[in-house]
C-alpha cells in the first residue's frame, strides 16, 4: 500500500534514486545541488511503499503569494497507479493553506 507523507527533512540518499530512475541528470551529476535544493524547499511530500520512497513532489516559492511545483517524480515501475495524482492533491491542499493564511 502506498502512503503519502509530508517530510520536514529529506535526506539525499533517500531520493537520489528517483532522479536517477527518470534521467534527471542535472541533479544526479551534481548531488550536492540536489541536497541544497531539498533543504531550501517549502514543502516536500514523499510516496512510500513500506519504507521505500517511490515518489516525491517538491514545492518552492515564497510561501506567501507564489508556490510552484518544482519536482514531481514517480519511479517508472510505479507510474500509472495514481501516485503522481495523490502527490499533486496533497500539494494543492497545502498550497491552499499557505496562500489562504497569507491573505
Report each predicted region and the residues it spans.
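Active-site rim helix/loop that mediates acceptor-substrate recognition in acyltransferases
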Residues: 24-44
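Conserved acetyl-CoA pyrophosphate-binding loop and the N-cap/start of the following alpha-helix
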Residues: 78, 82-87
Amino acid at each position: 500500500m502506498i502512503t503519502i507523507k509530508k517530510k520536514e527533512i529529506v535526506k539525499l540518499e533517500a531520493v537520489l534514486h528517483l532522479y536517477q530512475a527518470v534521467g534527471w541528470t542535472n541533479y544526479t551529476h551534481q548531488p550536492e545541488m540536489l541536497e541544497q535544493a531539498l533543504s531550501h524547499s517549502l514543502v516536500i511530500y514523499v510516496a512510500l511503499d513500506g519504507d521505500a520512497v517511490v515518489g516525491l513532489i517538491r514545492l518552492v516559492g515564497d510561501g506567501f503569494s507564489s508556490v510552484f511545483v518544482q519536482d514531481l517524480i514517480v519511479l517508472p515501475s510505479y507510474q500509472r497507479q495514481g501516485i503522481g495524482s495523490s502527490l499533486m492533491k496533497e500539494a494543492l491542499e497545502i498550497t491552499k493553506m499557505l496562500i489562504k493564511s497569507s491573505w
